[in-house]
Amino acid sequence: MAGGLPHPVLLVDEAAKSVGLYKLNDVFHAQVIDSNVIYAWFAMVLLIILGTLATRKLAMVPSGLQNFFEVVVGGLESFVVENIGEKGRKVYPFLCALFLFIITGNLIGLVPGLDSPTNNVNTNAAMALTVFAYYNFWGIRMWGAGYIKHFMGPFWWLVPLMLPIEIISHLARPLSLTLRLFGNIRGEEIVLVLLFALAPVVGTFPMYFLFSLADCIQAFVFFMLAMIYLKGSLDHAH
């Protein structure tokens, strides 16, 4: 099953079963570790391997994987600094790691025999709650008790109206991040399953380009929204 959907043999699932990670818990009769966690770990290991290969022989004139990672990482850093300012360098490592994990998690779901950790609502909720905690942490760290001014509006007489609106708005952010990514990736899985059922494997190849593009866009949207939330917490409240 791929996120609850029929799927070809999942290679990482089979490997996990062989080492006992999918043994049933005697009390709750559930898997010791859920499959979406296994695939999240797989995405992390893949990124670590690629990062190690890219930095194993650093050169002044980059090529291959080093060149690819320098373009991606450097481009993301420039984007963050342009939008947040120099303060963005403090939060950039978090944003970059978030983007790389999401795009890797999205894309591995397109590989036959693998599944995407981001088509599970729990994975996305964990990332969304981490973003929520992280930008509020930076807001409190930067402004202390004055961070509450971000929720009060520009005039004191608007506080009774703005405070509840802002609180609801901020609480809705993790839900929005979770459902946006989950809905898009799960929808992609459903379409892939239907295409495999209705058309030969070769007939699905053109869709892979479209889905790859959509996966990259969804990763960037999540990254950009997290950056906007961080920018709001780092900027001075007016």
Swiss-Prot record:
Its main location: membrane. One of its GO terms (biological process) is proton motive force-driven plasma membrane ATP synthesis. SUPFAM superfamilies: F1F0 ATP synthase subunit A. It is a multi-pass membrane protein. It holds the Pfam family ATP-synt_A. Coiled coil: none annotated. The chain crosses the membrane at residues 35-55, 61-81, 94-114, 128-148, 151-171, 190-210, 211-231. The keyword Protein biosynthesis does not apply. Key component of the proton channel; it plays a direct role in the translocation of protons across the membrane. NCBIfam families: ATP_synt_6_or_A. F-type ATPases have 2 components, CF(1) - the catalytic core - and CF(0) - the membrane proton channel. CF(1) has five subunits: alpha(3), beta(3), gamma(1), delta(1), epsilon(1). CF(0) has three main subunits: a(1), b(2) and c(9-12). The alpha and beta chains form an alternating ring which encloses part of the gamma chain. CF(1) is attached to CF(0) by a central stalk formed by the gamma and epsilon chains, while a peripheral stalk is formed by the delta and b chains. PANTHER family: ATP SYNTHASE SUBUNIT A, CHLOROPLASTIC. Belongs to the ATPase A chain family. This is ATP synthase subunit a. It comes from Solidesulfovibrio magneticus (strain ATCC 700980 / DSM 13731 / RS-1) (Desulfovibrio magneticus). The gene is atpB.
